[in-house]
C-alpha cells in the first residue's frame, strides 16, 4: 500500500508531489508515461513562465528544471515510461511499463495530473481533402522545438488559442511565412499579451469571425479557403478568401484528458470536461484528488502549480488524518456570463480562511462587476475593468462569507453601464 500515487509527471504532478512531501508524506510515487519529467513544458521553449511562481521570466524547460530540482531534494519515487491503464474507485492503479510489466498498485490517496490534449481536425469537421501538412499546433511545436523539423514554409493557423499564437511567432522566427490567423469566434481565445507579442509585433493578420471552409491538395496542402461566419458560426456565401499554403496548424481548443477519471466513476463537470472538485481539489471519491489542466484548462503554468500545491497538501492531510471529511457542502453555480467555476463544491467548515474561485467569462466585458449570490441575496461583489474568455479570472471568498450561505452560491457577471 502506497501512501500517495500521482498520475502524471508534468508541472501539476511535480508541484503536487513536492507539496505533499513538504506537508509530511514520505511514501510518494509519480507515474509518468513519457521518458522524462516536465510534461508539455519540455517543448515550450519560449519565455513567460515563472513570473508568479519564481519571480522571474523562464522558458518552459527552465521552469520544469526548477520543479525537478526541488523534487530531487526529496525522497519522492518516480517511474518513467509507465502508462496507467485504469484507476478503480477503491484506489487501485493498473499500469504497465517495459521494466516492470503489468502492475496493480494500491494507494491510500491518488492525485490525477494527466493534463490535457488538443482537439484535432476530426473533432471540428473541416471539409476538404486530407493531404499532408495539417498539424495540431502542439504537434508542430514538438517537431520544431524538440525534433528540429520545420513543418512548412507557408502557414495558415486556424484558431487563436495561446499555442496557435505562440506557433505563429515561432514559425516566423524559423523562416516560414505565416499568412494569417483565423478565429471562428468574434474574440481571440488567447491572452492579450500573446496577441500583441506573437501577431501584432510580426504583422500577422487576425481574422475574427472567420473559419476554414475548404482545404485543397493531393499529396500536400496547396490551398485553403477561408470565409466569414455569421452569429451562428455558419459561413456567409460570397465572403471567401483563398490562401496559397503548404501547412495548416490547428489551435482549436484543449480537452482535459479524463479517460481514467471517468473510468473510476468520478462525477464530471459538463462545462469544464474535468472532474467536479471540492475546495481542497478532492473529487467525488474520498482520497482521490485532481489538479491542473485535467480539471480545467489554465492560461499560466504558475496557476497550475499553485492549484497543485493545494492538491498535494490536501492529499497529505487526508492520508495523515486517515478519514474523509463529512462536512456539508455548498454548490457553486455559474450564472449570467460565467462559463464554469472551479471548485464546483465548497465545504465552509473545512475552509481555513478563504477559498479561491477560478472561472472564465463567456464573452468580452468592459467595466463590470462579479457578483456572488445565495437565494437572491448578494453576498459579495468584485469590480473589474475588463474581462475576456481567453483570460481566467480569480476571486477569493472568505470563510465568514461562506458560513452565511444556506444554499447554492451563484457566480455571475454584470456589465456596468456608465451614466
What are these regions (language model features)?
Residues 1-3, 80, 316-419:
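Rossmann-like nucleotide/phosphate-binding core characteristic of flavoprotein oxidoreductases
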Residues 17-19, 42-43, 123-126, 168-170, ...:
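Short amphipathic alpha-helical segments
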Residues 291-335:
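A conserved FAD-binding loop/helix module that cradles the flavin
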Residues 2-66, 70, 142, 151-197:
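Beta1-alpha1 glycine-rich phosphate/pyrophosphate-binding loop at the start
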Residues 112, 134-144, 247-298:
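FAD-site-proximal beta/loop scaffold in flavoenzymes
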